[in-house]
A protein has these predicted regions:
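Non-catalytic accessory segments of DNA primases and related replication-initiation nucleases
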Residues: 1-81, 85
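Phosphate-handling DNA/RNA-contact segment within nucleic-acid enzymes
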Residues: 9-24, 66-205, 218-219
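Conserved beta-strand edge residues that scaffold enzyme active sites
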Residues: 59, 188-189, 212
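Short beta-alpha connecting loops at secondary-structure transitions
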Residues: 206-210
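Phosphate/diphosphate-binding loops
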Residues: 211-221
């Protein structure tokens, strides 16, 4: 059995969406690092040279193949309507709510202030799609978000240089190797909105995308 980390629920309704993302980030990471079910995910990360230090820094987690988020957040008093609005649960055709992320490695997505606003889940088997992102919510607009920007923004501002990766894992590995101005798109498209997020005083953007058709399409924007 796994003992869950204690959390304090804030009373402000305005913060509920942020709260549930913050709570789940801690829960998913705790599950990755401490549960037997997280073993496969831990071994996958080890093969990609992502170890405990990076896991904690990037708050990587694991969502097991059960309704962990739904049951845990309901036990804290959060309503289904809020969880649906946050994209944490999904309503099935039969009308039953289930966890959106099941048996997936979890990458929290932060806004520019470092608040978790969404998740991206990577499958650890042959399930499709390979990556599953949170739906668009009042907090999360995919075309305006760059992975790791909240952490890299100071270095980007100081150097005027951005290293743009296609994937989260590449960005995480590069950070461990000393690249502190690396960010990643959530997929393969880099938009004008992304460019406006980075800022006006950028001297150079280094593209480190995959050399396949999807990656080449992204660099042509």
């Amino acid at each position: 059995s796994v003992s869950f980390p204690s959390v304090q629920r804030e009373e402000s309704n305005d913060k509920d969406l942020y709260d549930v993302h913050d709570i789940l980030t801690k829960l998913y990471m705790h599950y990755l690092l401490n549960s037997d079910e997280g073993t496969v995910a831990r071994k996958y990360l080890e093969k990609r040279n992502v170890f405990t230090e990076s896991i904690k820094l990037f708050q990587i987690g694991y969502a097991p193949g059960k309704d962990l988020a739904l049951n845990y957040l309901k036990s804290l008093g959060y309503e289904l309507e809020l969880l649906d609005k946050a994209g944490i649960v999904t309503k099935s055709e039969s009308g039953i709510y289930r966890d959106t992320f099941r048996d997936r490695l979890i990458f929290p997505i932060h806004d520019a202030l470092g608040r978790v606003i969404a998740f991206s889940g990577r499958t650890l088997n042959d399930r499709s799609p390979k990556y599953l992102n949170s739906k668009e919510t009042p907090l999360f607009h995919k075309t305006k978000i760059l992975y790791n920007f909240h952490r890299a923004r100071q270095e980007i501002k100081q150097t005027g240089t951005v290293v743009l990766f296609e994937g989260y894992m590449d960005c995480i590995a590069a950070h461990a190797a000393g690249v502190s101005n690396g960010i990643a798109t959530m997929g393969t498209s880099f938009t004008q909105e992304h460019l406006s997020v980075i800022g006006k005083n950028i001297k150079e953007i280094k593209l480190c995308f995959d050399g396949d058709a999807a990656g080449l399409k992204a660099t042509s924007i």
